Design a protein with these regions (language model features):
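Non-catalytic accessory segments of DNA primases and related replication-initiation nucleases
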Residues: 1-88
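Phosphate-handling DNA/RNA-contact segment within nucleic-acid enzymes
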Residues: 10-25, 68-171
């Protein structure tokens, strides 16, 4: 049986820009959480209400999506990513007029990693009291299928030598 190596290589290379834009988005979200005055409420929520230390926040690459309709999209476009790749990665959508807008706005962001540690999607908890879903996940994409990934699994692999037990919970 002949194995089509060239096709497999092309398939992987086509996914590379998606992984790249997701990694760039994660860095942007992390920066927003750690360095911006606008995210002070979110930092306080993590530390005071959820008892999540800055060290744990950093380990899991937690971030914050600004309230703006297009802050992330504009940052990523300014860094050379195309509108098409933002949409393919599940980071942006188009409104009825065709204008690009961010999927995640005013949310605490949880990057979801695959078994190799690559960011494949995001979970976001709303921080405002507006009428919207409390949690929002990246939609299905070429690199993210919700049923295939387990949040925190990659991080648990890093710590497995120091753990006696692992609990898997929902919600």
């Amino acid at each position: 049986i002949e194995v089509p190596y060239e096709n497999v290589g092309k398939f992987v290379k086509e996914k590379d820009p998606i992984y790249d834009v997701l990694a760039a988005a994660a860095k942007n979200f992390e920066h927003n959480l750690s360095d911006l005055d606008a995210s002070e409420q979110v930092r306080n929520y993590l530390v005071n209400e959820r008892k999540i230390s800055p060290q744990i926040s950093k380990k899991f690459n937690l971030g914050y999506a600004l309230k703006s309709w297009d802050a992330l999209s504009q940052t990523l476009l300014d860094n050379g990513f195309s509108e098409e790749i933002l949409i393919k990665a599940g980071l942006a959508k188009r409104n009825k007029e065709g204008k690009l807008f961010d999927v995640f706005r005013d949310r605490l962001i949880f990057p979801i990693k695959d078994r190799k540690g690559r960011i494949v999607g995001f979970g976001g908890r709303v921080m405002s009291q507006e009428d919207q879903p409390k949690y929002l996940n990246t939609g299905e994409t070429e690199v993210f299928q919700k049923g295939r990934e387990l949040y925190g699994f990659f991080e648990s692999l890093e710590d497995r030598k120091n753990l006696k037990e692992i609990y898997v919970v929902e919600g």
